[in-house]
Amino acid sequence: MGTTTMGVKLDDATRERIKSAASRID
């Protein structure tokens, strides 16, 4: 995935997955 949330509009489901992954790393 070369684009981020700023470059592409993600659906809520995808955003939730990204947030979950970020929380895990944090």
Curated annotation (Swiss-Prot):
Q: Which domain of life is it from?
A: Bacteria
Q: Report residue spans for region: Disordered.
A: 1-26
Tell me, using the record's free text, what induces this protein: By proline, autorepression and catabolite repression, and is potentially nitrogen controlled.
Please provide the record's keywords in A-Z order: DNA-binding, FAD, Flavoprotein, Multifunctional enzyme, NAD, Oxidoreductase, Proline metabolism, Repressor, Transcription, Transcription regulation
Residue ranges, compositional bias (Basic and acidic residues): 9-26
Q: In which pathway does it act?
A: Amino-acid degradation; L-proline degradation into L-glutamate; L-glutamate from L-proline: step 1/2; Amino-acid degradation; L-proline degradation into L-glutamate; L-glutamate from L-proline: step 2/2
Q: Which GO terms describe its molecular function?
A: 1-pyrroline-5-carboxylate dehydrogenase activity; DNA binding; proline dehydrogenase activity
| Keyword field contains Transferase | no
Q: Which cofactor does it need?
A: FAD
Does the record bear Oxidoreductase in its keywords?
yes
Q: Which reaction does it catalyse?
A: L-proline + a quinone = (S)-1-pyrroline-5-carboxylate + a quinol + H(+); L-glutamate 5-semialdehyde + NAD(+) + H2O = L-glutamate + NADH + 2 H(+)
Q: EC number(s) for this protein?
A: 1.5.5.2, 1.2.1.88
Where in the sequence is the signal peptide annotated?
Answer: none
BP terms from Gene Ontology: proline catabolic process to glutamate
Protein's job? Oxidizes proline to glutamate for use as a carbon and nitrogen source and also function as a transcriptional repressor of the put operon.
In Swiss-Prot or TrEMBL terms, this protein is called Bifunctional protein PutA
Q: Which organism is it from?
A: Klebsiella pneumoniae
What's the name of its gene? putA
